Each structure stands twice: as structure tokens, then as C-alpha cells.
Amino acid sequence: MTDLPDSTRWQLWIVAFGFFMQSLDTTIVNTALPSMAQSLGESPLHMHMVIVSYVLTVAVMLPASGWLADKVGVRNIFFTAIVLFTLGSLFCALSGTLNELLLARALQGVGGAMMVPVGRLTVMKIVPREQYMAAMTFVTLPGQVGPLLGPALGGLLVEYASWHWIFLINIPVGIIGAIATLMLMPNYTMQTRRFDLSGFLLLAVGMAVLTLALDGSKGTGLSPLAIAGLVAVGVVALVLYLLHARNNNRALFSLKLFRTRTFSLGLAGSFAGRIGSGMLPFMTPVFLQIGLGFSPFHAGLMMIPMVLGSMGMKRIVVQVVNRFGYRRVLVATTLGLSLVTLLFMTTALLGWYYVLPFVLFLQGMVNSTRFSSMNTLTLKDLPDNLASSGNSLLSMIMQLSMSIGVTIAGLLLGLFGSQHISVDSGTTQTVFMYTWLSMAFIIALPAFIFARVPNDTHQNVAISRRKRSAQ
């Protein structure tokens, strides 16, 4: 990229900065949840909603982000995303109750939902096609560093300052990013088709109310009848979307996508698989602090091997899938992740803390292999005219399933635990043991889906966007 103009390189730095902010925030909060609970006078069992409110908002807003960027301009939307994310961070730091914090996290989520996809779109518009891969590698590298630094930085800030600082550090960075965006980024626009507002609202309502209903009466404070009403509303909304999208060329996501078998299997497996794996980044630091008595900083440091294992495995995952095929790799990594989850629980409860970094490193390797395999399987056989829509749907499902996973983890803690648990409680480790056993079972379930994947070991990883028209 050395032959790119200076202005373009600065624009790539701005996009990379946005990726870093968004990825850092997805992990920096996890180690602070027990301290937040104590400060806000809440049970740690309720704090999973701090993560859910952010991730679910990202899932809901993702389908609209690309259309907004084309309609209003990439600079305007990227600037708006940074401003909303920064304001959300400020309101998070000022929150005095859990409900205030959840609303502020949702505002952060609106900004986060627009930041990454609009950043990708910006790179497509400012960089020549032949340099696109190199440019995307450059801007996504900070996004890989964010999860590495997040847990330890969050623990450090909580232990030596307060949890408010995990949000306050975003403010000066966000101000600089917003000013740089206005000064340096061009405002590309494109002619857009009419936005499928009806489909967007139906999907948003369906995803939001079903996730809320999953939290149960203990988590939401709602009666069983109200929970049943939420489930009914969510199911009706999703059924109405299916009816709306049938034979509708303007639908947010065309049902023609599901005529491709690998897409259907990959999407179903990704949804189920990320529900299980989405529990781990939330449960691990909470368990280390509340269940084992680790300090926030120590718990954050323990998460680093998992990220390192994930990053290291990305270098060889292509060769692994080419050698063994999607079915074998996905079934093996799904069952393997379940076993590693049990190994982590057993090692921790036995007090073999020196072994935990190695177990978490292994967990990161297995999880990374499964993620990469799920993503390429889902998209590899889509025709060109459905590839963009399929990628957007996969991105939405990834965020939705992670929010559901965290919700279920919180629900399990609530089912097995009392209203308040602490390190001094004699039943705390038993509560976590039952929760981890349940998680291991849930993580293993998608193996039944992946067992139906054709085991084509040739040309597995090349995303063959066959130039056939969708029928």
C-alpha cells in the first residue's frame, strides 16, 4: 500500500481506529461486571444484560447500516457512529442504576453497529480493487488487538481506578476520531433502492422480544404470562417477516438464500454454535472473580492466552479444512470445544491454576478453527447476486446468537444460584459447576447440524461465488 496517496492512508487509519474502538469495547466490559454489580447494588446474576443490550442492538441495527451509508454518505454515517459510540460511553460512565447503564449500552450499540460495516464499505470505495485485501488486512489488525488488550485493560482500570474508566477512556479517543473523520474522509454516496422498513421492523421486534423472553421471569421481573406474551409476539413477528419476504425482491434478506444447502446448514450451525461459544467470554472472567476469587486484573490477564490461541490458529485453519474437510473439522471442533470447557471447569475447581492459561490457549485455538470454518462454509457456494445479502445476514446472526448465548448463561446462573452469590458463599462453586456442565452440553449440540455437511475435502476454502443466477 506504499503507493497509495497520503490522504488515503490517513483514511485507512481512521477506519482502523474505528475497528479498534468497537472490538476493544466488546471485551473490556467483561472483567468489570462484578465490580459494576457491587457499585450499582445489583446481583452479579443480572449483569449479563450489560453485554446483551450492546450486542443485541448491534444485531438489530446491522441490516440498516450499509443502506444508510449509501444513502447519506460514508463520512456522515461513520462520523455519526463515532459520536453515538462516544456519547454512549459518556452516559455509561454517568449511569447510577443498571437500567440507565443498559440504555447507554444500547446507544453505544447503535454506533458500534454502523462503525464496522461502514468502515468496510469505505475501504471498498477509496482503495483500488487489486489492493483491497491488503487494505482490509491493515484496518482489521487493530480489531484483533482490541480483544487481546480488552480484558487485561478492563481489569487494570477496575482494580486501580474504577469501572467508570473503561468507558471514560473512549471519550478523548472518540473526539479525535470524529474530528479526523470530518476533516479527512470523503463522503461517498450511491443510488439506493427503497429500504425494506417493514421487514427491518419485523426482524428487530422478533429478535429483541425473544431475547428478552429468554431472560425469564427472574431476570426481567415479568410474570410468566408476560413472558409467554413476549414469546408469542416474537414468533408472530418472525413468521410475518417470512411471509413478507416470500416472492419480495425488495426484502431485507431474500429467502432465495436458503436454496443453497451449504448456506442453510452453515447459518443454522453458526447460530447454534455461537450461542454456546458466546457464553464463554462472559462466563470465564465472572467465574474467575466470583467463583475463584481472582482480582479483576488477574482475571483479565487469564483471558489473553485464549485470544493468542485464536490469533495463532488463523494462520493454519485453511490447511486444516483443506486436509480434513468441513464436516470432520466442524464436528471435531464443536465436540472438542465442549470437552475443553469441561477441562477448564475441572482444572479450575481442582485449584490447578497454573494449568488454566494452557487450557484457555487450547480453547482459543479450537474456537478460532470452528469460527473460520463456519463462516467460509456458509458463504462459499452463494451466487454473486446473493453474496452481499448472505454476508449481511450471517453478520446479523453472529451478533444475535452471541446475545442469546450470554442471556442463556445468565439464565443458567439464575436457575442454579440464589439471588445473590459471592466468593464467600459456600454454594457458589456448585452453582458455577452446574452452569459449566450445562454450557458444555449446549456447546456440543451443533455437532448434529455439522454432521449433515457434505465432506468435500477438495476446494473447501475457496469461496466459489459461482456465477449462476439465483432461481
Curated annotation (Swiss-Prot):
Ranges facing Periplasmic side: 1-11, 70-76, 125-137, 186-196, 246-262, 307-341, 417-430
GO cellular component entries: plasma membrane
Membrane-crossing residue ranges in chain numbering: 12-32, 49-69, 77-97, 102-124, 138-158, 165-185, 197-217, 225-245, 263-283, 286-306, 342-362, 396-416, 431-451
Membrane topology: Multi-pass membrane protein
Annotated localization: Cell inner membrane
Topology Cytoplasmic: residue spans: 33-48, 98-101, 159-164, 218-224, 284-285, 363-395, 452-471
Keywords: Cell inner membrane, Cell membrane, Membrane, Transmembrane, Transmembrane helix, Transport
Record flagged with keyword Transport: yes
Family, similarity comment: Belongs to the major facilitator superfamily. TCR/Tet family.
Name by which UniProt lists this protein: Putative multidrug resistance protein MdtD
Native source organism of the sequence: Shigella flexneri
Gene, per the UniProt record: mdtD
